[in-house]
């Protein structure tokens, strides 16, 4: 049994914070497969191989399920990465295709979770648009394979006081 977080800088800094605040005992049964500034192409070319290796390692130690939590998407929704706007609908479809295939390929003793892309403050990061994030999240939530449980951090944060620059326009 164990937990694997797969993601980008949000996952990387979550790992760093847990280690700094609580020490290595807090993450003894937690693996982090992450790379800052990356997204789906990194996952397909490097991250997935590491994730599968971690799944096999954790499954060999226990007969309990491994939880795999995906936290990817925000970097692929940045116009910095494309130079001239983002095909956010295409990005959502690419994620759906890969994640749904992955859900079929992985052992049934993996529990799959997908964490929504969090809201962004567009005053500080104008390269991302809230409407595109919401589309991406809504699309994934409604069309991911049923093996995935959706973790809606976006709505939780918006409901509990996080605000974005767009709200003030």
Give the residues covered by each predicted segment:
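Conserved SGNH/GDSL esterase-like catalytic core that processes O-acyl groups on lipids
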Residues: 2-90, 94
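Hydrophobic/aromatic beta-strand patches that form the interior of the parallel beta-sheet core
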Residues: 4-6, 113, 149-151
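Structured segments of extracytoplasmic/periplasmic soluble domains
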Residues: 12-13, 17, 21, 57, ...
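Conserved beta-strand segments of alpha/beta enzyme cores
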Residues: 29-31, 111, 147-150
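Conserved beta-strand termini and adjacent loop/short-helix elements that scaffold enzyme active sites
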Residues: 33-35, 115, 151-156
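Active-site segments of SGNH/GDSL-like serine hydrolases
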Residues: 71-75, 103-134
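Charged helix-capping and loop-helix junction motifs
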Residues: 88-100, 129-136
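Catalytic His-Asp segment of secreted/periplasmic serine-dependent ester chemistry enzymes
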Residues: 120-169
């Amino acid at each position: 049994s164990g937990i694997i977080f797969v993601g980008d800088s949000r996952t990387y800094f979550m790992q760093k914070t847990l280690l700094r605040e609580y020490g290595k005992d807090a993450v003894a049964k937690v693996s982090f497969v992450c790379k800052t500034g990356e997204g789906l192409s990194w996952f397909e070319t490097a991250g997935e191989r590491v994730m599968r290796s971690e799944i096999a390692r954790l499954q060999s130690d226990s007969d309990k399920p491994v939880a795999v939590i995906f936290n990817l998407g925000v970097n692929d929704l940045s116009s910095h990465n494309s130079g001239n706007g983002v095909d956010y609908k295409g990005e959502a479809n690419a994620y759906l295709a890969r994640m749904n295939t992955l859900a079929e390929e992985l052992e049934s003793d993996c529990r799959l979770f997908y964490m929504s892309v969090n809201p962004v403050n567009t005053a500080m990061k104008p390269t991302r648009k809230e409407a595109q994030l919401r589309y991406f999240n809504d699309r994934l939530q409604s069309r991911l394979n049923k093996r995935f449980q959706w973790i809606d951090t976006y709505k939780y944060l918006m409901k509990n006081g996080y605000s974005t620059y767009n709200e003030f326009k």
